[in-house]
Amino acid sequence: VYKRQLLKKKMHAVKSMGRRFEREDENMTAMPEEETAIYFELGTKDSQIPAGKTVLDYSLDQLTSPDGGRVLAEHISLRIRGSEKICIIGKNGVGKTTLLKKIAKDLMERSDIRAEYMPQNYEDQLDLSLTPVEYLNTTGDKEEMTRIRTYLGALKYTADEMDHSIRELSGGQKAKVLLLKMSLSNANVLILDEPTRNFSPLSGPVIRQMLAAFPGAIISISHDRKYIMEVCEKVYRLETHGLVETNLQSEG
């Protein structure tokens, strides 16, 4: 019953955002579909985390490459409390994605938080053989399927895209599936690897605003300076000797 009430609230919010888009679209010059902005709400008051709660207290003596062939970094330590939003930056190949995968594995096994993960390769998390509706529907209930179709429609999926396998979708559409899953699961911790990279320039500001307003915690990797400045409260640079908190503004 609680889950259905939560879905109804989210459906109402998505419908309202869809109507808002339609009103604004009437006064705008027509643009290609891939440049269409999306309006999306992520999280509820139930996604809030008490300020004193330790979300992550992570330490690792050595971060090795996926094949175990070389040491990427040493003496890694990261602590996150409450609804902090942090970003890990660093040079390509330094091990950011490898580290985030390890953190995601630990957090998603926890029962005291509700963590969801957007990997760099969406295929690591998505079942490509399913349609978006099948992937998002957790109960098999027809009423829930109808709600999910309403959500997807508000996110500019065509009816055809809703019934095609996820494998056939664009990178941006796959990212939307993952974001919608995060919303429907009422996650309070988001683990995001380059979350803005597949969204159009028009949707980028909306995605950043949505993530900045998320009431839970965010642990992310990004090269997107706008995302880092607008969403993240703390920034850590991954160096060979560990994570170093840094001020992005001072780096120019």
Residue ranges, per PLM feature:
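Coupling and communication elements adjacent to P-loop NTPase active sites across diverse families
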Residues: 3-69, 81
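ABC ATP-binding cassette signature C-motif
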Residues: 1, 48-252
